């Protein structure tokens, strides 16, 4: 007998939910989207009409429903904790936008609550679910560029409209939490968990008191270095390069590739360039698949996922602790 479909509620009619995540949820044969909530009833109604679900006025009303198994929470990071906690206390599985929280203690507390109740809590960090990074990892493991010496990663985007949530530091958290988290996570993925924050410069806009860009320097205990750049006042850039003793690997469109994108891994060696062409991959669909599997098979599948989320939050705090702020 097939398992019943997983009934999702969407806590917030965010743009990422509309464009990417909810279509991926609905494309999974074992998922249905029941309702969406928003403080803006007209926005919720438009969202619901687009996906054939019910519009609910206010997030608490969605939490109080009895026909929801899981909640997708695309709210701004600085309000994640109260709503994720409330959802877990109501017995709901939770898929929450990255980052889970802005602090290590906050991440640990939510993960502990989910585990104590046997519930799935997953961070919606979709780029981690794209197959291109596995290919790069395999090339590194095979010694394609010799011993790894450094990583350079950048994720930058053009300025957003004036009212964008990213410019509200007490809600959206600014560029470090929304954009800088991508190169930070790449450093954790390729260089391992024992990263030291050697320094950082954060460019903070005086008018809105929000971080709009930054550079971070990380090191491992063995001296491998990561140089990271991020921001929302630049031309678009989404890439990383791994430098080794015998060459370098470069990947463009590393963090937010569309489903139609055909990745190309560049392998640069002395006087030679090789290209590894990869097929398109649907990272949002992959994440939804993994979430459903965790619900069906048990949250024990997420032990490494949770450890990585805690390390990520810890690294963010350590970067902020050493950062020098430059006002603009």
From Swiss-Prot:
Pathway assignment: Antibiotic biosynthesis
SUPFAM superfamilies: Glyceraldehyde-3-phosphate dehydrogenase-like, C-terminal domain, NAD(P)-binding Rossmann-fold domains
Keyword Lipid biosynthesis: no
Ligand binding (substrate): 20, 236, 256
UniProt keyword terms in alphabetical order: Antibiotic biosynthesis, NADP, Oxidoreductase
GO molecular function, one term: oxidoreductase activity
Family: Belongs to the Gfo/Idh/MocA family.
Name of the protein described by the UniProt record: dTDP-3,4-didehydro-2,6-dideoxy-alpha-D-glucose 3-reductase
Species of provenance: Streptomyces antibioticus
Gene transcribed to yield this protein: oleW
């Amino acid at each position: 007998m097939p398992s019943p479909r997983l009934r999702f509620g969407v806590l917030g009619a965010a743009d990422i939910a509309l464009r990417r995540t909810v279509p991926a949820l609905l494309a999974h044969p074992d998922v249905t989207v029941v309702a969406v909530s928003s403080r803006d009833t007209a926005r919720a109604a438009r969202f619901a009409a687009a996906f054939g679900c019910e519009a609910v006025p206010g997030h608490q009303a969605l939490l109080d429903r009895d026909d929801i198994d899981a909640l997708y929470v695309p709210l701004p990071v600085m309000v994640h904790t109260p709503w994720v906690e409330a959802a877990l206390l109501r017995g709901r599985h939770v898929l929450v936008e990255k980052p889970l929280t802005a602090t290590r203690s906050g991440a640990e507390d939510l993960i502990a609550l989910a585990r104590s109740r046997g519930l799935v809590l997953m961070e919606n960090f979709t780029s981690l679910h794209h197959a291109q990074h596995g290919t790069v990892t395999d090339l590194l493991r095979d010694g394609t560029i010799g011993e790894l010496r450094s990583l350079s990663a950048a994720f930058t985007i053009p300025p957003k409209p004036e009212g964008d949530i990213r410019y509200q530091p007490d809600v959206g958290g600014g560029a470090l939490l929304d954009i800088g988290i991508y190169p930070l996570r790449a450093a954790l993925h390729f260089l391992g968990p024992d990263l030291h924050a050697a320094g950082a410069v954060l460019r903070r806009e005086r008018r809105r008191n929000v971080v709009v860009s930054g550079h971070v320097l990380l090191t491992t205990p063995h001296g491998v270095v990561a140089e990271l750049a991020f921001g929302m006042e630049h031309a678009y850039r989404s890439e990383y390069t791994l430098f080794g003793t015998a060459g370098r690997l470069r990947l463009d469109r590393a963090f937010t590739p569309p489903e139609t994108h055909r990745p190309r891994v560049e392998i640069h060696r002395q006087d030679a360039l090789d290209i590894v062409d990869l097929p398109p991959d649907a990272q949002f669909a992959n994440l939804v698949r993994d979430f459903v599997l965790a619900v069906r098979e048990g949250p024990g599948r997420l032990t490494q996922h949770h450890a990585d989320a805690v390390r990520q939050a810890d690294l963010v705090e350590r970067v902020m602790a050493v950062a020098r702020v430059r006002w603009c």
